[in-house]
Amino acid sequence: MRLLPIIGGLCWCCLLALGQAESGSVAGSIFDSAHAPAAGISVEARNLETRTDYKAVSSAKGEYTLVQLPPGKYDIFVINPKYGPFVRRGIVITAAQPAHLDIQLSSNTALTTLGEMPELRELLSKKPPPPQGPAPRVADGKPDFSGVWLISPSSLGGSSQQPDLLPWARAIYRERVLNSYKDKPSARCLPELAGFLARWPIRIVQTPKLLVALRSDDVISAHQVYLDGRSFPKDLEPSWQGYSIGKWEGDTLVIDTRGLNDKTWLNMFPHTAKLHITERLRRPDLGHLEVETTYDDPESFKTPFQTKIVNVLSPDEEVEEYVCAENNQYSQHVSTN
């Protein structure tokens, strides 16, 4: 009678071995942005047919192995707050041959993917150095931010903190990465968040009571900042660009923006209508405009986080009209489901 449990155990082991023999694996090493082995990094594989996810964690030496993968095509990805997202699509897994994939992680530029915009890189490479001299001032002695501005080459890599996302926001961000950002609002001619990141030329017009930023890369081409000492309306209706009030702290203009809706993307990150943006603008000299931005949304981020960029004065540039319906060639590839 003792043979029955033994035989049963042998049969189970045989079935388990057979299942492992019919599955595949992928292994490799993970390196951080300094090219050193990255330990404790979660790497995942998504079966493109079943949409099933498989997970492994890298060892102290940065090595990982994803096992028991049914044969088929997979997306292999790492989405970690410390690094930029890594996605390798369409990896073929077979039972006969283990796959190998080393993963090189990049530094996280958080709110800017500008380094991946070849058109912008080409434009900036042809720009002459910004003009030199002291920052101009208006009649009351405050710095004058007026002019046409474009992001500096030194800011292409970004100087930004990574938002520490709450679980619901992290899950949405993860899916946006895996879906190649196909539902990004701008792909449907919807507005982006206002701000002074000059990916393409922006013109700032400054008066004693109002500052206006004119853009050439968004559906809403003008963003108003009130400088007349007003307070926020009591019943602030959420809108695409929110409501912005500016106050001076010495030579720094502090812009407080509230009343944003939750429809825009903060680069690729989700946010709620609780999002509060604080921008600090400084013009240390004639040719440079420093922009430090703090994002606070307690319903999306565990703590506030900052970005820092520098724009350069570009008097040879113009802010041209932007007609999204004519320019948006990507929309035909976006799912309408």
How would you label these PLM feature ranges?
Residues C13-L15, S25, R137:
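Generic alpha-helical structural signal
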Residues P5-A17:
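Bacterial N-terminal signal peptides
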Residues I41-V43:
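Short beta-strand elements bearing conserved aromatic residues within extracellular beta-rich modules
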Residues A45-N47:
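Conserved aromatic beta-strand anchor motif in extracellular beta-sandwich/beta-rich domains
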Residues M1-R2:
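N-terminal secretory signal peptides that target proteins for export/translocation
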Residues Q20-E22, S29, S33-A36, T52-Y54, ...:
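PEST-like low-complexity, intrinsically disordered acidic/proline/serine-rich tracts
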